[in-house]
A protein has these predicted regions:
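Glycine-aromatic micro-motifs
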Residues: 2-166
């Protein structure tokens, strides 16, 4: 009878930084049933942007800050997120960031960055949900106001040549 070793990764969890629609607790519960909410966090040296596909992304930007939330996710959740974010079709890619908790602790976290970073203004249900989630989780009010600068009159379209972040 052969003995098998239990997998060390069986209970492994990944720290995930969400800055867009995945900040929403109900949405994450539906997308990733094993996800556990950790709390709010910030990532320095990155800026928020809405790309030409009308999706949120972040990109490296000296002196900028992105606020969001941290989750712990299982390997199965990460596979679901990879599918949701379009990793296989190159819409997004995984990226490691240094996330700072409100108490000052900094931890490495996985996030997703869109491959298309050409900016645009946006609107509609996706962006409304993103803003609502940002408010519900308690992101700083001045940051939420900055997020709102990505909204276009009437919903989709327009251009914003800058990047957001303090």
């Amino acid at each position: 009878m052969a003995l098998t070793r239990p997998s060390v990764r069986a209970s492994a969890r990944t720290l995930y930084f969400a800055y867009g629609s995945n900040m929403d607790v109900a949405a994450m519960a539906a997308r990733c049933p094993g996800a556990a909410f950790v709390g709010t966090a910030r990532v320095d040296g990155h800026a928020f942007r809405v790309n030409r596909n009308h999706h949120a992304t972040i990109l490296p930007a000296a002196g900028k800050v992105v606020h969001g939330v941290l989750w712990t996710i299982t390997d199965a959740d990460q596979a679901l997120l990879d599918e949701y974010e379009g990793v296989a079709i190159s819409l997004y890619r995984r990226h490691e960031v240094q996330a700072q908790h409100p108490d000052g602790r900094v931890e490495a976290a996985m996030t997703y960055m869109a491959r298309n970073t050409e900016p645009t203004l946006t609107g509609g249900p996706y962006f409304d949900a993103l803003l609502a989630a940002a408010r519900r989780v308690g992101l700083p009010s001045d940051y939420v106001l900055e997020l709102e600068t990505w909204r276009s009159e009437g919903g989709w379209g327009g251009r914003n040549s800058g990047t957001l972040g303090r």
